[in-house]
Amino acid sequence: MTILLVGLGAALGAILRYQLTRIGNHIASEFPLMTFLINLTGSFCLGWLTGSQLSQPVTLFLGVGVLGGYTTFSTLNSELSQLWFRRRYHIFFGYWLLTYGLGLLVAAAGFYAGL
Amino acid sequence: MKIKESLAVGSFAFFGGILRYLIGLVLNQPTGFPYGTLCVNLIGAFCLPFLMRYIVARLHLSDQLALAIGTGFFGAFTTFSSFSVDAIRLVNQQQWSAFAWYVGISMVGGVLLSLLADYWAVKLTHNPEEQEVSQ
């Protein structure tokens, strides 16, 4: 049962990420803005969810499922690798440092907002 | 809306998310080091670029299947939100060295594995002998 909650949540989260990324494709920018925003908003929400300590099924569905499926680590690094191979070093380092720096910051902000 | 593509992404993400959860159950320690999240993230960081730039061309996968496996399965298998919240938990528990190792390995290891996968994919694609074998 918990497995189904996680799976369904992940499916919803991934579809949301896919639709947002499609919208983002219309923005002509070399900076992967959509993945960036998805990972930051997801980190904030999971921080909030963790801080507010809701019941286990809700946390599993929303946290492990929806937000786990919504945010992504593989696309982030794949985009970084592409920026490196295209020699866009400024964007590479900007995207890399901003994602991790702000990601940790908003996760902490979400956590304390949820307490 | 791309309903068909969305359903393909969602159904593969269903399994990606479940696999991440199961690996986390086995490897993550509630008060310790998030080995499970680190493990799925590093595997995904290598597999996604290698899939998109080598396997798709080699096996002539359709765009829709590539999208389902890449954006759906590997996108949901890996996670950034658990990474950042796990890291904040280590800070709250004042496990400074675990925090530094976790963030360091994720930050550097993730991008190195993607670079390696891309590099290897390009090398395999442009190697004439390799193409000979495949015929």
Swiss-Prot record, chain A:
Q: Which Pfam families match?
A: CRCB (PF02537)
Example of a GO cellular component annotation carried by this entry:
plasma membrane
Q: Where does Na(+) bind?
A: 68, 71
Origin species = Latilactobacillus sakei subsp. sakei (strain 23K) (Lactobacillus sakei subsp. sakei)
Its gene name is fluC2
Domain of life of the native organism: Bacteria
Report the protein name in the record.
Answer: Fluoride-specific ion channel FluC 2
Q: Where in the cell is it found?
A: Cell membrane
Which InterPro entries does the record match to this protein?
FluC (IPR003691)
State if Transmembrane is listed as a keyword: yes
**Protein activity control:** Na(+) is not transported, but it plays an essential structural role and its presence is essential for fluoride channel function.
The molecular function GO annotations come to: fluoride channel activity; metal ion binding
Curated annotation (Swiss-Prot), chain B:
Q: How is its activity regulated?
A: Na(+) is not transported, but it plays an essential structural role and its presence is essential for fluoride channel function.
Provide the GO biological process annotations. cellular detoxification of fluoride
Which Pfam families did the record assign?
CRCB (PF02537)
State whether keyword Nucleotide-binding applies. no
Q: Which InterPro entries match?
A: FluC
Q: Which reaction does it catalyse?
A: fluoride(in) = fluoride(out)
Keyword annotations from UniProtKB, A to Z: Cell membrane, Ion channel, Ion transport, Membrane, Metal-binding, Sodium, Transmembrane, Transmembrane helix, Transport
User: Topology in the membrane?
Assistant: Multi-pass membrane protein
Give compartment(s).
Answer: Cell membrane
Binding positions (Na(+))? 75, 78
Query: What does the record give under GO molecular function?
Result: fluoride channel activity; metal ion binding
| TM ranges | 7-27, 32-52, 65-85, 96-116
- Gene Ontology CC, one term: plasma membrane
Give the family, as the similarity comment puts it: Belongs to the fluoride channel Fluc/FEX (TC 1.A.43) family.
PANTHER family per the UniProt record, alphabetical? FLUORIDE EXPORT PROTEIN 1-RELATED
The job of this chain, per UniProt, is described as: Fluoride-specific ion channel. Important for reducing fluoride concentration in the cell, thus reducing its toxicity.
**What name has this protein been given in UniProt?**
Fluoride-specific ion channel FluC 1
User: According to the entry, what is the taxonomic lineage of the organism?
Assistant: Bacteria, Bacillati, Bacillota, Bacilli, Lactobacillales
